[in-house]
Amino acid sequence: MATKKKTNFDDITKKYGAERDKALADALALIEKDFGKGSLMRLGEAANQKVSVVSSGSLALDIALGAGGYPKGRIVEIYGPESSGKTTVALHAVAAVQKEGGIAAFIDAENALDPEYAKALGVNIDELLLSQPDYGEQGLQIAEKLITSGAVDLVVIDSVAALVPKAEIDGEIGDSSVGLQARMMSQAMRKLAGHINKTKTTAIFINQLREKVGVMFGSPETTPGGRALKFYASVRLDVRGSTKIEEGSGDNKTQIGKITKIKVVKNKVAPPFKVALVDIMFGEGISSTGELLNIAVEEGIIKKSGAWFAYNDEKIGQGAEKAKNYLKEHQDVFDEIDHKVRAAHGLLDDSEVAETEEETTASKTKAKAKKEEKXVETEEIELELQD
């Protein structure tokens, strides 16, 4: 009886595996040729790439965002009640981008931007690109052209609620315009999302709040413009004013600002639901000294005992306002604490981390040398006493 030849599956796997690998390599080369480098990659290669960000202009918010700022090439939505600080938060991002040498644009659909206030927040108004469109489609088309140019780092649209479709503007008051704005925003998101990702532009959409009628359970709050923006946004921030900041006492109390809570309700680049508490001072914006003081106390870098604040065992003020004034007047101390806070939260780049490690090593070496010197002095004293 003839013996049946045993099939070697390893040889078959190797043969077809080699053919498959060659076919895949050819397909990848063709895709790269037709659509450009990076149009298709292995997930492992993409995972190793660190998310590029632009600073929000607020240390507390950069920490809450997890990645260290707003992600480049993504859409961000900032929403909240009236006068909660939404535009202030966006303008700080504009100032931060300009500080790094970037170009920012502001689509002012509400026609409410105050140049003097923007200047007080650190915005270079001479370099800021500003548009006040007549209708919604025009504003979105201007934003699209700026984004596709690849020359702009940040585009702010203020606000989605004010992007009124042309058909609604041309019509009469009282005409039905159900779904017009939602359709406009849905189409805009489909067009803009790809361009934003390709050019690595950060797009910030400021939005207002509305209330749904007849909601019995859950929050009745919603944002205008349909659902498209909610889906396409990588980051969504809920901005709400909470506590008054006052100075003086009794009848002479004056409100000089407010503590604002910024909640990260959606985040595709880091864990969501983190909260940043910032001091928004009237005429000044987010207080950098205020948020640094709060975070440094949380991290134990600045010690708080009762109403007193101390750094390196030296008292810097009784009460938060005096401690903030001390940090304003002593820039070197502010920079030192800021560096320590950023190091604690991994917000330093590689060169700064290396510099910090060198400083730490030098500090430890110095402390060790001092300890050894003290020990030698002690031994000499003991020998003298014995003699």
From Swiss-Prot:
For this UniProt entry, the molecular function terms from Gene Ontology, in alphabetical order, are: ATP binding; ATP hydrolysis activity; ATP-dependent DNA damage sensor activity; damaged DNA binding; single-stranded DNA binding
Q: What is its main location?
A: cytoplasm
CDD domains of this UniProt entry?
Answer: RecA
What Gene3D superfamilies does the record point to?
P-loop containing nucleotide triphosphate hydrolases
Q: Which GO terms describe its biological process?
A: DNA recombination; DNA repair; SOS response
User: Where along the chain is ATP bound?
Assistant: G80, P81, E82, S83, S84, G85, K86, T87
> Where is region (Disordered) located?
348-387
User: What GO CC terms are in its UniProt record?
Assistant: cytosol
Name the keywords, alphabetized: ATP-binding, Cytoplasm, DNA damage, DNA recombination, DNA repair, DNA-binding, Nucleotide-binding, SOS response
| Compositionally biased residues, Acidic residues | 349-360, 378-387
Organism superkingdom: Bacteria
Q: What is the role of this chain?
A: Can catalyze the hydrolysis of ATP in the presence of single-stranded DNA, the ATP-dependent uptake of single-stranded DNA by duplex DNA, and the ATP-dependent hybridization of homologous single-stranded DNAs. It interacts with LexA causing its activation and leading to its autocatalytic cleavage.
Question: Which family is this protein grouped under?
Answer: Belongs to the RecA family.
Name used for this protein in its record: Protein RecA
Q: Which gene encodes it?
A: recA
